[in-house]
C-alpha cells in the first residue's frame, strides 16, 4: 500500500489536515513518526463531526462554528445540498461573506432562536426555504422532513450562544441527542 493510500484510510479527513500530512512527506519526515502521530490523533468533537445517517441523509455536528468564517468553511467542504440549522443572535452579525456560499450550497435554513430577524433578513434572497424552530428538537425534526436522499443536515450556529452560560459542547450535545431521538423513531 502506498503512503497516500495509507493516508486516505487514516482518521484524517479534513483537507487542511491532509495537506499537513502530505507536507510531512515532502519534507521527508519519517513515515513511522507520521503513522504514530496519525494513530494518536483524535478527532475534536463538534467540528464538522459526523453523527449518523438516517434514510440516506447524513447529520453533522458543527457546534464549534460560532462565527461566520467557521460556518463558511463547513459549507465550502461539501458538494451535497445542505439543510442548515443556525442560531439567531441579538448581535449585529455581518453574514455578507457567507451569502454566496449559502446560495450555492444551502437548500434550507432552520433558525433556532427567538432572535432570528437579522439571520432571516440576511439570507432571504439567498435561501428559498427558511423556517423557525422553537428548540433543537423541533429544528432537527423539521430538518429531517425537509432533507431528501443525499442531503446533509448541519448544525453550524454561526454565532455564540445567546444563553450566557451555554457552551458549544452543550449545544452540540443537544443536537446529537435530538438526532438520536429521530433515529430511534425511524428504527421503530
Q: Positions of the model-derived regions?
A:
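Internal glycine-rich flexible loops
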Residues: 6, 17, 31-32, 38
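Glycine-rich phosphate/diphosphate-binding loops and the adjacent beta-loop-alpha structural elements
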Residues: 6-8, 18-26
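Short, conserved micro-motifs enriched in small and acidic residues
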Residues: 10-15, 65
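ATP-dependent carboxylate-amine ligase
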Residues: 22-30, 36, 40-46, 50-188
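A short glycine-threonine-serine/GTX helix/turn-capping micro-motif
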Residues: 2-12
